[in-house]
Regions:
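Divalent-metal (Mg2+/Mn2+/Ca2+)-assisted nucleotide/phosphate chemistry catalytic cores
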Residues: 10-137
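Short, glycine/charged-enriched secondary-structure capping and boundary segments
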Residues: 4-6, 57, 151
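Conserved nucleotide- and phosphate/pyrophosphate-binding catalytic cores
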Residues: 116, 124-219
């Protein structure tokens, strides 16, 4: 996935992908049930993508134009910086978009870095199934440079970290992340978050709010 990447991603082996999947499912299982009568389903898109032949890929590629792809902000930045854009990166939004078609979804939820990919799926759903698909894009926590926090960037707080490490990582965040951190990573009511934002703006010491944020995240 080239989303939000200034350079091509490092290619992973299938074994690495499967191992990452196990880790993500393990972390997600703290919030989502993968067993029982109403369990969440975990699907590999190889279930349908592996069945596609080259004719199918060409047919799918005919649903979008190069101009549409080049309007993507990440590709615009690469072009301006004279960095390469590979064909497989062009194909990725189509492949992810086709996941929606294959599963016949009604709604897709993802981080706002996935908006282009999810809207590609919406367009494909319209053209291939004459069906509307709704997209919900959620905020992502970004560091002081505007780069989203994640595994690739090495600046995330992992659910697998010890409470001490999680606390320390949050305390290392810039003050600008305090309010977004409360909004995105805690269950505090928004009126309390807005109140803290106003207090910080009036000159209150941000450190005490950051300590409270770290406690909320760790608990």
């Amino acid at each position: 996935d080239p989303s939000d990447k200034s350079a091509t991603r490092k290619k992973l082996t299938r074994e690495q992908v499967l191992q990452n999947c196990k880790e993500y499912q393990k972390q997600a299982s703290r919030f989502i049930s993968f067993s029982g009568s109403n369990k969440a389903l975990l699907k590999f898109n190889s279930e349908w993508l592996a069945k596609m032949n080259f004719e199918n890929v060409l047919e799918l590629a005919s649903q979008m134009t190069v101009d549409q792809m080049l309007k993507r902000d990440m590709f615009v930045r690469r072009t301006e910086e004279n960095k390469p854009i590979y064909i497989h990166e062009f194909l990725y939004p189509l492949m992810q978009g086709y996941d929606s078609v294959a599963m016949d979804v009604d709604v897709e939820i993802g981080g706002n870095d996935q908006t282009f990919n999810m809207l590609t799926g919406r367009d494909l759903m319209k053209s291939l199934k004459n069906k509307e698909k709704f997209v919900i894009a959620t905020k992502l926590l970004a560091d002081s440079t505007g780069v989203k926090m994640g595994k690739t960037e090495g600046n995330m707080v992992s659910l697998d970290q010890t409470p001490e490490d999680m606390f320390g990582k949050v305390m290392s965040w810039s003050d600008a992340l305090i309010i977004p951190g409360f909004e995105i990573c805690t269950d505090l009511p928004m009126f309390e978050v807005k109140q803290m934002e106003a207090e910080i703006a009036r000159g209150s010491n941000p450190k005490e709010y950051k300590v409270n944020l770290a406690k909320e995240i760790v608990k």
